Every structure is written in C-alpha cells, then in structure tokens.
Amino acid sequence: MKAVGLVTEYNPFHNGHIYHIQQAKAVTGADVVIAVMSGNFVQRGEPALFDKWTRTQAALANGVDLVIELPTFYAVQPSHLFAEGAIKLLTALGVEDVVFGSEHATVDFLNLAKQAPSVQGGKAFQEKNQTFAQAYATQLESETGFKLEDPNDILAFGYAKAILNLNSPIKLHAIQRVAAGYHDQSFTDDQTIASASSIRLALHKGKLEKVKGVVPNQTLVDISSANHTVDFESQFWPLLKYRLMTDTIGQLGQVYQMAEGLEHRLAAVALGEPGPQSYQSFIKAVKSKRYTFARIQRTLLYTLLNVKVDQMQAAMQDPYLRILGFTDKGQAYLNGAKKTTTLPLISKVDQHLAKANLRLDFKAGKLWQLLAREPGQQQDIARQPIHFTQAHTKEDK
Amino acid sequence: MKAVGLVTEYNPFHNGHIYHIQQAKAVTGADVVIAVMSGNFVQRGEPALFDKWTRTQAALANGVDLVIELPTFYAVQPSHLFAEGAIKLLTALGVEDVVFGSEHATVDFLNLAKQAPSVQGGKAFQEKNQTFAQAYATQLESETGFKLEDPNDILAFGYAKAILNLNSPIKLHAIQRVAAGYHDQSFTDDQTIASASSIRLALHKGKLEKVKGVVPNQTLVDISSANHTVDFESQFWPLLKYRLMTDTIGQLGQVYQMAEGLEHRLAAVALGEPGPQSYQSFIKAVKSKRYTFARIQRTLLYTLLNVKVDQMQAAMQDPYLRILGFTDKGQAYLNGAKKTTTLPLISKVDQHLAKANLRLDFKAGKLWQLLAREPGQQQDIARQPIHFTQAHTKEDK
C-alpha cells in the first residue's frame, strides 16, 4: 500500500482540511492517508480547541486512515522543530510522499533548503530588533532571492530541511493555498473554506451560524458540548500568574526556552501592581521585538507545564508513534509498518508510560482538561485508539 | 510603660477578642496591649478570612495598641512552633506578661512544661495509628497526670515550653475560656461570644444575621465588600490540583513538612480519574490517622506556596518584627522598644525585602489575593503601618 502523509493540527477540523485530503490522494495516487497531528496543544502554544480524540474522530470521518499524535515536545516548537518531528514520524512509518499547502506552491522547497544558509552564518543575525526567524529569512533572501515569510512556506521549508537532515526518502508536493490565507481573520458567508484562525475567532465570538458554511456539522456539535477551550485564557492566566508568583527565579530560569533573562521580566510583570488583568495584556506587557507572539506563548506554556530544559532534551531523544485512531485501511497499513518501523508504536498508555516517555503528553492532557470549560474524558490512561468503520460513520449520522 | 502581649489570629475579630483585651489589661495592669497576629494565613493552613490590614484595623479599633505580624514561617506551624515564634517576638519587644484563654486556667503551665517529657522519650511514640500530638499527650499524662487535649491548653503549654527554651522573662496568665469552646460549631441568638470557627461557619453559610450578635459591626461590613476568602476552597483546589499535576515527585518531595512519602499519595489522588471534585474530598482521600487535618492542610498550603525545606529553615533563622499598625500609645511604646530590641523592626517592605527575608509573607499575600473573591489592595510593597487615632475612630463611625 502506498501512503501519503499530512502534517496537521486540525484546530478545528474544517472544509479546507477535506480539500487537503482529497488533493493529497489525487496528487500522489496514494491508497492510505496518514495524518500526524498535534495533540492537546498546538504549535502556537495554545490548547487545541477540541481534545485530540475529538479531532481524530473528525479526521477519520473525513478521509484520513490513520492518525498519529505529534508528541508535545515536537508539536509545541518553532516551525523547524515542529516540521522535523513530523517528518521523522512519517519517515518511520514508511510514508513516501507528503502533501502540504503553500503560499508559493511552485517553489522547489527541497532545492531552496539545499541553498539555505547555515544557522550561525551571516551578518543579519547581529540585528537585535528582530526575531530569529526574521533574521534567518533576511539571510536566505540575500542568498537565494526567495522571501520566506508566509507561514505555510516556512513550514514547507522546515519539511525540506528535515528531509535533508534525516536523509529521508520522502518526496514533497506543494498545493497552492486557496481562498483563505493562514492569517485571514474574517470570511464571508459564501466562502466554503476559511482559515482555522478565523474559524476560532468566530467561535470565540459565539458566531456559530457564521461557521456553519466552512466546517463539517460535527464541529458545531462539539462546540455546543462545552468540552472545548474556546475561552481557555480565563483559566490559563490565573494558573500562570500563580506559577510565576510562587516559583523562584531560579526555577523559572530552568524552563525550556526561557532565554536571555526573560524569567525576570515575566515574574516582575506578573507580580506588579495592579498587574495585567488578562492573558492578552500580560503577553503584550512582556513581549519584545526579539520574540514572536507564538514564541512567547510557547515559553509561557512550558512555564505552566513546568517543563525544564533537561527534561525536554531527554524527551526529544526518545520519540514514539502514538496511535490515536485508524480506519480498516489504516489498520492494515499499520500491520505492515509494525514490522519495519524503527520507533516504538504505542496504542495504549498505562501509569508506567505516563510517568516515563509520555509524561509530557500526559501532563498536557491533564492541563487541557483543566483549561476546558468541561474536562471531559481523561486523555491518556487506558484510552484505546479509535477504530473508525463505515458502520460507525452511519451510526454517527 | 508596661506592656501585655496577646497571641492572636483574629479570624475574624469578634466579641470574645474584646473580652480578652479587657481581661488582659485588668489582670496585669498594663498600659499598652500588643498583639502578635498571624498574617494572611492562619495556623490551620487556611487563608485568613480578611487580610492582615483589615484585621489589624479591627484590633486597633477595639483596644489593641500595637499589632505585629507573626511571620508565615511561624504562623503556619504546629502549635509548639507557632507558640515559640510568638513568644520570641513578644520577648524581643520587651513584653513582660502574656495573657491567654485556656480550657484549664488553674493549671500552672510553666510548671507542667518543666515536668514535660523530652520529645524523643517514651514508648507512646511507637504507636502508628495516632498523630504526634496524641502520642506526646499520652506520654505527658502518664508522667504528670494532666491530659493536654484542648486546643488553648496546647497553645498555653507551647508558650510555657518556649519561655523555658528561650529563657524569656515573660510571665503567663491564663484566663478561663467562657461561653464558647474553640471547636463549638454553633451558637445561640442570645450568645454575645462565639468561637471564631463557628462564626466562620455561619459566614460561610451566608448567615450574616446570626453573626451580628457576636462580632463588631465592622466585620459585617467587611464581609459584604467581597474582599474576603469565605469561599477560598473553590479557588484553592484547582490551583493545588494544577501544582500536583505539573510538579515532579522529586520537587513535591522537597516541600516543607512533606514526610513519609506523602507526595506520592497526593499526586496519585490528584491525578486519579475521575479524581476528587473538591478540596474537602481531596483532603479526606489523602488523610491518614498519622496526621491531623490541620497538619495535612498546612502541608498542602506549603505545596501551593512552593516552599521547600531549606527555604523554610533559612527563613526561620531570621525573624523580624513587622509592624502592621499602632495607636499613639503603641507608637510611643515602639519608640522605646526600638532602642532595646534585638530583632529588626520593619515598617515598610520594598522590592528588596520582598525578595529576601519577607519573601514568604510576600508570596502568601499574593496567594491570599488570588484566593479572595476580590483581590483588594496589595499586601506588602509600599504599604504603611496603620496609624490609628481616636479621630480616625470617630470618622469610621
């Protein structure tokens, strides 16, 4: 069986994702669609709108055959590490092709990656008033003429770099992003595809009617069940404030990605009087030109999760393939992959795993439940992968 | 000027405290009444109902001349350390007499303390199914014939032991507890004095009318302002659960008074599914016969405050006299005491002190604000001691 891989967050699952799945099959002629998906927290350091099981269910109901969790230590990372983690898992599963959306689908990203500057080189890295990504893009443009600035292009570049680094046989296929830019914050009533961020914004504002045209019906059902994190900030901020006011500067300084004395600023702002009244105003108060919003938010999430540098480095050395769900076809593919994969396949998490390799995902699941309006089912211990069958689909309708 | 010392929590300030102040003056003929008072957290490991400034105001309005904060590292402790901390501060202030309520006011507690067994001795300490305090009381009874079991007697015994340990010149004066036992959970409409715990219970149930007869009017005004912690458990439990789910067992094991592997039980219960739904059910699930309710609750508070054994031991080596408020008479007494006291007198807390000696009180104040229905004013930085004058009193009426 030939498998095509997708790197996804499905936050939430929407019509654009259905188009992506259809195109992936059409472009590659694959029999099986495998999605590597962020778990309960997404790349920008936020809880996913719905938990990983709900999003797995949506993916399986709409054409994906196998959903593998991108572990938290890969998912909540800058794009190059996010991309490398995903490519590593897909390579281990024997996937031959990866199809992704891009703002510049005609660009040969693998070729671009081959010409890319090494991270340390170039004078652009001296500038203080820009983020690392901006500095890197400036350097890349001066050497190749291509301006790497759109989010899907940046991810595509990350996949290409990862393929080179890992010596992976995966072939990349870009499809042109249509209708909705990643950062578009609004959409019209006659659109059938909208960006995930604009959908989240509409849901946050309670505009369910507006969202109807751009998501499968199940997403509307899920949002009405209250087991979601649309309003997570009202829970996130008191917990973060509590953490910042009780940990020592020394403890905060050990948090993953806490760099350049950022811990001092975080503590000073959190403990100030009257102090920020919301998560958004806190981030505004601590943000500098050196960091992107997402970078700050990821660091704050790692602060909240109490993840230290050494724990993170150890975890990243030890990846695994956590199976969240499959169709019959996905199961058949898995049976073949079992014999060849070099990474451990995990279908059930017990107390031992929750304290060892999967500790970070386990903590993330517990935190997700705490941030959701209703905690719902536990996320890891004793949960079985979803086996999605056509009968099941009918039952759901 | 002759000063009498009172060891207090004023949680909340009630008519029994007025009686205590009057008796203290009558028994000793003192000119000045000095109260050492728990700060924002009380001995049983709970946030005080009102913050330390509100309670200081009530004390000054009702006959106390000087209020000194009992630092958190003394206040939130078993009774012998609580008592020793208070006696240490009162001794440093040149206080000659301490007057306290007792269930057995005719007992000579100093004499009892002289006959007391040393902590290590005796076979009663071998029993596993009792608390340390029970074991000690059993041993004491077998040697002296006196059954030390009532809470105010236990504190009195603590004062006496402290006087011996510190070689303090303080003389103890017991007054018989009247009308309300420490643990009485109810009171009748014709009572004018009720126990603090029964008053807290009535306030928790929203029975303001019932409380009118046993507290000064100001307490009723304070409860209506929402800057109080009557419902603290609904805030306390999610924060504690969050702490237990994100810290490692190693980190939890370093918390002050975390003994005999208790951290494993706390984490296992907190992370279990479905898990306790409230703070009370959590405590019930983790409590054993080896620990009193108060002991468990103090340990949980130190867990929430993230206070480690070494930090606590260092803090206890370095006590101070934090001035919360005074009358003119109290101020005059302070001016004299300044010249002779061996402990630092602190009237204003800046960022430096908040990060050094007073760090624990500072954190406790921040946590108190987080647990209160409305956070109110900040508790430490730049707060001035209350200077209470008669004009001020009139203004308040």
From Swiss-Prot, chains A, B:
It is found in: Cytoplasm. It comes from the Bacteria. InterPro entries: Rossmann-like_a/b/a_fold, tRNA(Met)_cyd_acetate_ligase. ATP binds at residues 7-20, 101, 152, 177. It catalyses: cytidine(34) in elongator tRNA(Met) + acetate + ATP = N(4)-acetylcytidine(34) in elongator tRNA(Met) + AMP + diphosphate. GO terms for molecular function: ATP binding; ligase activity, forming carbon-nitrogen bonds; tRNA binding. SUPFAM superfamilies: Nucleotidylyl transferase. Keywords: ATP-binding, Cytoplasm, Ligase, Nucleotide-binding, RNA-binding, tRNA processing, tRNA-binding. PANTHER family: TRNA(MET) CYTIDINE ACETATE LIGASE (PTHR37825:SF1). Catalyzes the formation of N(4)-acetylcytidine (ac(4)C) at the wobble position of elongator tRNA(Met), using acetate and ATP as substrates. First activates an acetate ion to form acetyladenylate (Ac-AMP) and then transfers the acetyl group to tRNA to form ac(4)C34. This is tRNA(Met) cytidine acetate ligase. It comes from Leuconostoc citreum (strain KM20).
